[in-house]
Amino acid sequence: MALIKASQARAVRENPHVSHQFNISSFLGDPFAIGTLSIALISWIIALAGSIAVAASTSPFPRFSWWTIVYEILLMITLFIVYCLDLVDYYRMFITCAVGIAFVYTSNSTNSIVYYEGSKSGAAAAGFILLSMINLVWVIYFGGDNASPTNRWIDSFSLRGIRPSVLETSMAIARSQRLPVKPSYPYQYQEDLRSASLPDVHHDDEGEGHSGNMYAPELQSSTKYVSSTVLNGFENTDHSSSKPNLDVNAQNTATLNTQATGTFITDTTNANTDTTMGDTLGLYSDIGEELNSFPYTAEALYTYQADQTDAYEISFEQGEILRVGDIEGRWWKAKKSNGETGIIPSNYVKLLDGKSH
């Protein structure tokens, strides 16, 4: 079968931004969005019809309830657009605040109309009560992290599966920053670091306005921290060529160990991918727990041949089972059963149900 071209793979990775296009399937693939928005729309129609009927009668109608009706329909339209553009995680806090305001509005309108007599006011009050219930459900969902039990249970019914958790990712990065990385071949690695300059840890993307040293307190200690860019050129180190360097005496070994020179994972955006990865994808680190770096299991849908000029890509066969992590971008970091690590195109694999254990 036809394989992806190296130029196409590089072109995809050169753009660190994910394009969001209007796609109705993103909305239709989420049962929670369809169900809640459908019920909210029906409730809104009931509230609108009841309010018009009450206002047309002799009974005085609270004018603020009209703004409640307008605000609620604008909120539903916004949610529909956000789902179609797949921007829910980007505007989660805004949605939570907007829904919280809507909950206050609908609750106030309910309190103003529910005590009116007649079927017309009863219909309007029922519509506002249903809208208040839907708004409360939205506050619980959008106000919670994707890793929360309620969100994970709700997202499990979605065709796209459970959404990635920013909280879990940040916690994993924080844990990994407290654990020193131990290279597989420390003696040659230490020798290479002596001849390498140690730049300050910084974000590669200057457009974000982040510069300077992010970890100044740590850099002032005796332990040296190396940016992932220092490792460029070392990724294809031949095992056989490094074996002679392992023949050193115990004194040199003690000296190297006492220097405590290591690489700590840095939260930096790799220029070759559109995902945030530390320590050059974390491919040359042993942070103690493999599940932190490769928590998911994926199956290869097609055969992929890695670009020989790209040191980070790995090849795999159709049907091969891989351990993957950082699954938010087009390129995922992966580990094969033979221990080989690298990056793979996400459209060539599919995630299996559940996390790896």
UniProtKB/Swiss-Prot annotation:
| Segments on the Extracellular side according to the record's topology features | 53-63, 115-121
> What is this protein called in UniProt?
High osmolarity signaling protein SHO1
Q: How does it sit in the membrane?
A: Multi-pass membrane protein
Where in or outside the cell? Cell membrane
Which family is this sequence assigned to?
Belongs to the SHO1 family.
Q: Which gene encodes it?
A: SHO1
Taxonomically, the superkingdom here is Eukaryota
Q: Which residues lie on this side of the membrane: Cytoplasmic?
A: 1-31, 85-93, 143-357
Q: Which CDD domains match?
A: SH3_Sho1p (cd11855)
Q: Name one Pfam family in it.
A: SH3_1
The SH3 domain sits at 293-354
Tell me which stretches of the chain form a coiled coil.
none
Key words, A-Z: Cell membrane, Membrane, SH3 domain, Stress response, Transmembrane, Transmembrane helix
